[in-house]
């Protein structure tokens, strides 16, 4: 059903239509992860259809960037608009970041995985075009903040298949998932 109500043309890609922050770099998605992704893809399509029917503006407010841009300049530009101000309480800081993102039409959702689920998701977050970020609820707010900012990078680049661009050069950073 969602295929027929989606107003966008089908995207031709060898990979999935989204980019994930997984537990391990270049890992295969588990069945649980695929279920969560499918659920949020359907929610994203439904939201897109409803926003068109309700004349709700979902235009992107932030600029598009590429991997050739100077990362420091990009960070400085976007910090002015997206940085809510630091708060020592990480939960409050995460909430203020999400609120600031919503002011710029970036939707942030969170999924909670129960301890007794048979097929667990092996992703910490993912980005869906045009403006949806999905995070896995973590015990550590620091890790959720890291994943949120990571996915913001994909939003700013507007590139979902970035794995193909960066390749295996970043396998040395596999330990980052321990944060």
Region roles according to the model:
Residues 1-179:
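Short juxta-domain linker segments that transition from a proline/glycine-rich
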């Amino acid at each position: 059903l969602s295929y027929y109500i989606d107003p966008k043309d089908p995207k031709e890609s060898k990979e999935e239509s989204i980019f994930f922050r997984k537990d391990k770099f270049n890992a295969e998605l588990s069945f649980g992860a695929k279920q969560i992704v499918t659920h949020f893809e359907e929610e994203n399509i439904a939201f897109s259809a409803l926003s068109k029917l309700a004349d709700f503006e979902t235009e992107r407010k932030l600029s598009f960037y590429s991997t050739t841009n100077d990362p420091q300049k990009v960070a400085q530009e976007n910090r002015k608009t997206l940085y809510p101000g630091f708060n020592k309480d990480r939960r409050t800081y995460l909430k203020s970041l999400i609120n600031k993102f919503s002011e710029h039409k970036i939707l942030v959702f969170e999924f909670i995985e129960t301890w007794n689920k048979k097929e667990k998701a092996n992703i910490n977050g993912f980005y869906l075009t045009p403006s949806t970020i999905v995070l896995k609820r973590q015990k550590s707010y620091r890790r959720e903040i890291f994943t949120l900012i990571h996915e913001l990078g994909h939003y700013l680049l507007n590139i979902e298949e970035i794995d193909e661009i960066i390749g295996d050069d970043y396998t040395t950073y596999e330990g980052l998932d321990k944060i």
